[in-house]
Amino acid sequence: MEFVFLGTGAGVPSKGRNVSAIALQLLEERGQTWLFDCGEATQHQILHTSVRPRRIEKIFITHLHGDHIFGLPGLLGSRSFQGGTTPLTVYGPKGIKQFIEVALSVSTTHVKYPLEIVEITEEGTVFEDNEFHVETKRLSHGIECFGYRIIEKDIQGALLVDKLLEMGVKPGPLFKRLKDGEVVELENGTILNGKDFIGPPQKGRVITILGDTRYCEASRELAQDADVLVHEATFAAEDEQQAYDYFHSTSKQAASIALQANAKRLILTHISSRYQGDTYKELLKEARELFSNTEIATDLKSFPVDR
């Protein structure tokens, strides 16, 4: 599992930062990539990374401001042009379906893969399978905006091979049956319960990715005990009132959410273009005064998510 930040700026592109898009690489977990937001030129940013459009399985949109969605039509079309055939699902607030369908229709763009668009109308679970569970809550922004909590389900423990070998059980079909938790009988009449030969499960990881938001309780709830919290930090602490007026957060407020939620790690993004060059490091300094395990994303930077 790895983050690739494709765009980390706020509002409009700047020389140093493109607008919002984050790829969550789940190559080891499911051989796919999930994308969170898709600002303009996202597909161009992808060209500079290991992200492959054909592997994008899901796109989660936080809200419908242009800096978070204007890259969608181009990416969806290019994925088809480049030979993508596997299904893709886009999740987002009400209106995302109309935006995509009109853009593709007017531009006569035809996608050759199954494209499903899911409009989120209620908080709660938006996706779940045997590996992951994705929950959402409304944040505090000028328009409807969602934050996402991605929960990796616990992974079954490894088969205790050494223990079986000590008992004289040879590798083969019995190993698979025992790993599946079956009760088996050996040739000598010994009964083995597969559950007794499975190590402890690996705890799944929790990732929280928030859209644009003021400091709010929903952010803390989504980030509770997260392994990684990705939070916007549009403004410095001295501009807290301006952040409030424009429905955004300061770096210090992001750190406060991480601290209250007992998150393990904080990554700041959505940085205003007023912080050019190394001036953005002041945002990092302010956040670390409150929450030491803070990093700030820059375009094309990757962050592995360890177990």
Swiss-Prot record:
Cofactor: Zn(2+)
Molecular function GO terms recorded: 3'-tRNA processing endoribonuclease activity; zinc ion binding
Annotated Zn(2+) 2 binding sites: 67-68, 212, 270
Active site: 67 (proton acceptor)
Binding site for Zn(2+) 1: 63, 65, 141, 212
Catalytic activity: Endonucleolytic cleavage of RNA, removing extra 3' nucleotides from tRNA precursor, generating 3' termini of tRNAs. A 3'-hydroxy group is left at the tRNA terminus and a 5'-phosphoryl group is left at the trailer molecule
Keywords recorded for this protein, A-Z: Endonuclease, Hydrolase, Metal-binding, Nuclease, tRNA processing, Zinc
EC numbers on record: 3.1.26.11
Coiled coil stretches, renumbered: none
Cofactor: binding details: Binds 2 Zn(2+) ions.
Family per similarity comment: Belongs to the RNase Z family.
Primary role: Zinc phosphodiesterase, which displays some tRNA 3'-processing endonuclease activity. Probably involved in tRNA maturation, by removing a 3'-trailer from precursor tRNA.
UniProt subunit comment: Homodimer.
HAMAP family in the record: RNase_Z_BN (MF_01818)
Protein name from the UniProt record: Ribonuclease Z
